[in-house]
């Protein structure tokens, strides 16, 4: 079974419920991740995405964080701050997906949750979930 790690900010649930299930492991059939599968995983209708390369993995692939072009995947009020072991920081509003990027440019998942967690861990030393205050009318 091939899987990817999806950050799901779950806007319909309360803040504490989301914190315990923020990163979810999702199955990807056939191993290669196409755009349609990414949109399905994050519930996105915009069809415009951006890749943030977090670093090189021990297997020669790269760890990419896939977000929509506006950084939201349709969710404007919640997100994550990611800090890696070097204290580099990235802020993402909404849902996102961690994938491996091959030298050929394909996005692929992992065959083991343990290997996936080991690959992601150095680049996500600290993940902080946040919620923006709602605007007053």
Give the role of each language-model region:
Residues 1-137:
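Short beta-rich binding modules
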């Amino acid at each position: 079974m091939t899987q990817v790690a999806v950050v799901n900010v779950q806007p319909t649930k309360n803040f504490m419920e989301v914190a315990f299930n923020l990163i979810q492991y999702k199955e990807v059939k056939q191993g290669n991740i196409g755009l349609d599968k990414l949109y399905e995983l994050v519930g996105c209708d915009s069809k415009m995405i951006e890749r943030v390369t977090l670093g090189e993995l021990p297997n020669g692939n790269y760890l990419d964080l896939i977000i929509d072009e506006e950084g939201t995947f349709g969710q404007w009020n919640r997100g994550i701050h990611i800090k890696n072991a070097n204290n580099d920081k990235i802020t993402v509003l909404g849902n996102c997906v961690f994938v491996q990027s091959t030298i050929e440019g394909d996005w692929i998942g992992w065959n083991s949750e343990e290997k996936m967690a080991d690959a992601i861990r150095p680049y996500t030393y600290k993940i902080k979930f946040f919620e923006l205050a709602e605007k007053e009318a």
